[in-house]
């Protein structure tokens, strides 16, 4: 049995903003120096850049990156550059990625998430910081594993009911 093909409603811009706020609040949690915690802002940013590239672009990515830089007290622009590159590459592949299943989409998104985590590391290494270690490589994998869940949650308000409602005019 195949999954039904859903006809999606237009996305509400308030819901997009709400999803970014919730992802940012997740990133604000006091994890300490734990490197394997997924970057939910990056995951939500890739999702909206793939599904709604005209509503969420590189400007939003840059602004969110600056917010993350201020939160992490890092060099101003580390996350901004990483998120801008992430948005650019996600918008570049968005038409191709949408043709695949959710699990294959996760495999397509995984290199983008690795790039997003590698850019701040390269910037810090150029500034003379030590190499952070292997747990940093786990975070993009966890984010890719969260891709099907993020897709289900973030597309849920747009999905129409599969059951026919007799009282609905359209």
Predicted segments, located by residue:
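Terminal, non-globular segments
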Residues: 1-170
């Amino acid at each position: 049995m195949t999954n039904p093909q859903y006809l999606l409603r237009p996305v509400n811009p308030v819901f997009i903003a709400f999803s970014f706020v919730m992802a940012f609040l997740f990133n604000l949690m006091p994890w300490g120096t734990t490197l394997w915690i997924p970057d939910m802002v990056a995951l939500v940013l890739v999702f909206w850049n793939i599904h709604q590239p005209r509503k969420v672009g590189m400007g939003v990515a840059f602004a969110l990156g600056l917010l993350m830089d201020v939160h992490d007290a890092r060099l101003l622009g580390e996350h901004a550059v990483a998120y801008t590159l992430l948005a650019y590459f996600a918008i570049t592949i968005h038409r191709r990625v949408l043709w695949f299943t959710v699990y294959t989409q996760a495999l397509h998104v995984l290199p983008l998430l690795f790039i997003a985590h590698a850019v701040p590391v390269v910037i810090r290494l150029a500034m003379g910081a030590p190499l952070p270690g292997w747990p940093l490589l786990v975070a993009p994998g966890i984010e890719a594993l969260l891709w099907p869940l993020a897709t289900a949650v973030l597309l849920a308000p747009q999905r129409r009911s599969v059951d026919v409602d007799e009282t609905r005019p359209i």
